[in-house]
Amino acid sequence: FVVCTQQQSMTKDIYLASPHIGVSSRRTGVLVEDIYLNRKQFSRQIFLRCQHYSTALQILTQQPQAILTIPKNILVHLQLAQDLNIFDVPVELPNIDLGMYWHKDLQLNSRHSFLRSEISKIFA
């Protein structure tokens, strides 16, 4: 994970005190980052929740104090405005292992194989 923001520096105190944009395909519920932060007895303020990282990056350009925590391997595939800075996350977040499942009938399907390959490139 990395942090995107217009802020000029990033510390643990700044990270925890700043307003955050949360990204999730679900409308409600705890975000994966918050599960790990809560385990360390940290919390953050989610002021806005959206479903796409690209939308969150656009919002960051209009919210100078806002912060987005985003997987580094996703960020490299998105457009980043020039006024946004990238920092390492100042709190420890674990790596998250992702897996893919598909029906055995699709194993030899060339289109499905291509799609799996592209997904692996993004999330590897």
Which positions does each model-derived feature cover?
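A late-sequence structural motif
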Residues: 3, 12, 84-124
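Hydrophobic hinge/microswitch elements
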Residues: 26-85
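Secondary-structure junction motif
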Residues: 4-6, 10-12, 17-40, 108-110, ...
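Residue-level preference for short coil/turn positions at secondary-structure junctions
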Residues: 16-17, 64, 94-96
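Structural motif
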Residues: 2-4, 21, 69, 101
